[in-house]
Swiss-Prot record:
Protein name (record): Cardiolipin synthase A
InterPro entries: Cardiolipin_synthase, CL_synthase_A, PLD-like_dom, PLipase_D/transphosphatidylase
Signal peptide: none
Active site: 223, 225, 230, 397, 399, 404
Keywords, ordered alphabetically: Cell inner membrane, Cell membrane, Lipid biosynthesis, Lipid metabolism, Membrane, Phospholipid biosynthesis, Phospholipid metabolism, Repeat, Transferase, Transmembrane, Transmembrane helix
Membrane topology value: Multi-pass membrane protein
Lineage: Bacteria, Pseudomonadati, Pseudomonadota, Gammaproteobacteria, Pseudomonadales
Gene3D superfamilies xrefs: Endonuclease Chain A
Enzyme class, broadest EC rank: transferase
The species this protein was found in: Pseudomonas putida (strain W619)
EC number: 2.7.8.-
Chain's role: Catalyzes the reversible phosphatidyl group transfer from one phosphatidylglycerol molecule to another to form cardiolipin (CL) (diphosphatidylglycerol) and glycerol.
The family this protein is said to belong to: Belongs to the phospholipase D family. Cardiolipin synthase subfamily. ClsA sub-subfamily.
SUPFAM superfamilies xrefs: Phospholipase D/nuclease
Catalytic reaction annotation: 2 a 1,2-diacyl-sn-glycero-3-phospho-(1'-sn-glycerol) = a cardiolipin + glycerol
Amino acid sequence: MDYHSPYFFGYVLGLVHLLGIIAALHAVFTVRTAQGAIAWAMSLFFIPYFTLIPYLVFGARSFNAYIKARRQANQEMHVAMANLNWRPWVEEALTARESQSYAALRAMPKLGRMPCLANNQVKLLIDGRATFDAIFAAIEQAREVVLVQFFIIHNDTIGKALQQLLLRKAADGVKVFVLYDRVGSHALPASYSQSLRDAGVQIHAFATRRGWFNRFQVNFRNHRKIVVVDGVTGFIGGHNVGDEYLGGNPHLSPWRDTHVQIGGPVLACLQESFAEDWYWATRQLPPLILPDAYPDNGVLCQALASGPADPQETCSLFFIEAIHSATRRVWITSPYFIPDEAVFAALRLAVLRGVDVRILIPARPDHRIVYAASSLFAFEAVRAGVRMFRYQPGFLHQKVVLVDDEVSAIGSANLDNRSFRLNFEITLLTVDRDFADQVETMLTTDFEQAREITPEDSSKTHRIQQLGMRIARLISPIL
């Protein structure tokens, strides 16, 4: 074949355009938003030589292979859990239905795949030292099974400390399962995992590149942070395993984040979420533990697991429902503020209802493009009457929602499109006045250390910066 022939060049162009048409049809059927589908389809149809590769990397919005794996995992879990004593767990689910505060969140029972459960114990863990001290202490006490899942695991001081602890527990005969995201933990050396594997720890990466079309995908990421010890103690929140979460990065220090320690029936839901992800990675199920009884008092909790395999956009709908349910206040903290149109409309409507709407975001960037897009959305929110604040001491990474006087949510989900539609996330919804008071105290302290964004801040921004913000917003759906 003459590669210098003009016919060869024409064949290549024709092939690229054919692939562009196929990809455009794929976008029409799979991209969840009309705007996204139109943008991808038009660009793939007319300029596929510029957009075909980006679409392979960033374009897919559904994760059908995971849906099939979840279905198979659920079938195997039903068999594996048939001999477990579910009666106490069911009783806690029935008790939770009597809560008037939870009833105000009218869509939540059907929105989440997991029910609200009564009689849980929750403890607020503010910042990295408290979080990792509690996690390490719980793992030290493990006797049967330890489940560990993080988006990022670094081979640094805290990462090596976790590794050594898990090695000791494996030597004691404890079954240890570790799951990390392949993209988030791309810098983790193979030797880290291999040393754990050699000691009997089962460790795997969560990767989304199964099948030919998905092999280029880095868009779907497992952003969940879950630790469950012996089915009786669990943790969920915003921390990953890295020294920066303990203030080890001078540019971002002090790092501000929040986790929750959990006990009670809701841990069965955390185990279910872990089991589904583990099954995707290994086609096996980890052991699941249910206690024979639960305490007679505690708080209402619902684990809200969300991701691109859901039939609807669970994470986005949660934020919308939480904002719509607010009658007095809704306070939100998130490192990234890139709301979709529905969430932004919910925020504006809450302001018009007289709700105290406050959102706390970082004053320092960890990703400059995301920071630029967040800044533009923040200016628009201020013009709509939302009170926007920038946290001054260091980088703010916590993901917290406080609604009125009883409802709070803490987890891994950010207020951005990636959490809404692309990432696997998990959030703990808690309905309890005392715990909400603790969250209020924590957030009040954070707001006191923040500077409120004013309308004048937008006018003081240089036009070049404004242009950069608007360009960043154009690509915000894939940030």
